[in-house]
């Protein structure tokens, strides 16, 4: 998938019920050992699946995922982002671009916490359940891209027909970020790529 004339590799996939053996075959030995320490089978799947997906996307340029001090996944010479929901996993890779992705399933519970992340000026663009999930996903994407403090009131999002326009307020300075999105039947996906 191409965004802003830069190669972006993006993949979203529904989680299988059980961990397929071929997911394990692509893991480095250290990754296999790390995964075996995870007692919960669903968490093992969440560990293995994005690594399998990244290996498939990157072929020989795949390298081990390392997490920085903020818990953000990184890979040598490439910007990556990983997102999990209950039933989906999404990964994105960018070369010479910082990337972020978020996948969210439509769920009613978001209505109970909307007051924590919806700004007054966003209420006209984002008022249905699907819109609120899209807004949440956009703010998660901005958070992942900027490594900002997780105060979603510092993120503003406007919706156009084809894109989302995000604004991150940091120490009185606003930075604009263009995001793409896809609305599926059961989930929405938001991603972005910005120059390094």
Predicted stretch roles:
Residues 1-99, 103-196:
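Core catalytic alpha/beta fold that binds nucleotide/phospho-ligands
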């Amino acid at each position: 998938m191409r965004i802003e004339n830069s190669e972006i590799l993006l993949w979203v996939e529904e989680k299988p019920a059980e961990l397929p053996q071929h997911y394990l075959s692509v893991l480095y030995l250290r990754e296999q050992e790390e995964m075996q320490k995870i007692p919960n089978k669903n968490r093992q799947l969440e560990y293995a699946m994005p690594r399998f997906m990244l290996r498939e996307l990157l072929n020989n340029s795949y390298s081990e995922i390392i997490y920085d001090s903020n818990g953000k996944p990184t890979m040598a010479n490439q910007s990556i982002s990983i997102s999990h929901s209950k039933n989906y996993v999404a990964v994105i890779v960018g070369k010479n671009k910082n990337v972020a992705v978020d996948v969210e399933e439509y769920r009613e519970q978001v209505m109970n916490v909307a007051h924590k992340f919806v700004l007054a000026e966003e209420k006209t663009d984002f008022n249905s359940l699907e819109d609120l999930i899209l807004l949440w996903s956009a703010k998660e994407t901005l958070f992942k891209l900027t490594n900002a403090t997780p105060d979603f009131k510092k993120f503003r999002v406007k919706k156009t027909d084809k894109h989302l326009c995000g604004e991150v307020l940091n120490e009185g300075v606003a930075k604009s970020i263009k995001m793409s999105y896809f609305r599926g039947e059961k989930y929405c996906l938001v991603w972005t790529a910005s120059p390094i």
